[in-house]
């Protein structure tokens, strides 16, 4: 009998287990693609036609995790660590561009913490109202299921970006981490 790695979604799980498992797989794959790099590698604009960096993606997805699980899900404003970072009202590109000012340790901690916070908030919402529970975005017309699909879409896009960037930085390729790699979140 083989034991699936912690990022592998269940083969025959419930809808919640499948959705959360798919999201955790993308989170783990993204984190592995960005793992273990220094400032120069995280800030490397490895694709000439793009300003994207792995550091920028780490910070952007950390912001997305907290924004989806507060502003979009509950309507609440994001608190720390964002409140003390000078997050602008229109933060569309801020995570991408401001990451150059952060150390690798800060970026990894920011991302890992945001994943933990988002997971806790989503699991609490699931316990209280399930996938059909309304969320704050668009006046409650969205449900949690749709919010999770949007988060999966965001991760799908940026995990693909991270795949190309990491290969350009040091040649790392592949879909999954080694089986002994443990996601730090």
Locate each region found by the language model.
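Short, contiguous alpha-helical
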Residues: 2-9, 16-91, 133-185
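Charge-dense, low-complexity intrinsically disordered segments
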Residues: 6-13, 17-20, 98-105, 109
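Acidic/histidine-rich alpha-helical segments that form the ligand environment
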Residues: 91-135, 143-156
């Amino acid at each position: 009998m083989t034991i699936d790695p912690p990022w592998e979604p269940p083969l025959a799980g419930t809808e919640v287990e499948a959705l959360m498992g798919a999201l955790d797989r993308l989170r783990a794959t993204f984190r592995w693609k960005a793992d273990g790099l220094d400032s120069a590698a995280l800030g490397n604009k490895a694709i000439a036609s793009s300003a994207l960096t792995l550091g920028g993606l780490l910070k952007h997805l950390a912001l997305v995790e907290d924004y989806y699980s507060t502003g979009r899900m509950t309507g609440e404003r994001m608190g720390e660590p964002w409140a003390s970072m000078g997050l602008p009202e229109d933060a569309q590109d801020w995570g991408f561009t401001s990451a150059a000012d952060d150390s690798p340790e800060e970026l990894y901690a920011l991302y890992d913490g945001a994943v933990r916070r988002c997971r806790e908030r989503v699991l609490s919402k699931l316990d209280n109202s399930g996938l059909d529970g309304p969320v704050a975005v668009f006046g409650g017309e969205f449900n949690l299921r749709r919010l999770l699909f949007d988060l999966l879409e965001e991760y799908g896009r940026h995990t693909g970006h991270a795949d190309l960037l990491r290969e350009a930085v040091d040649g790392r390729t592949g879909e999954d981490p080694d089986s002994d790699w443990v996601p730090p979140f």
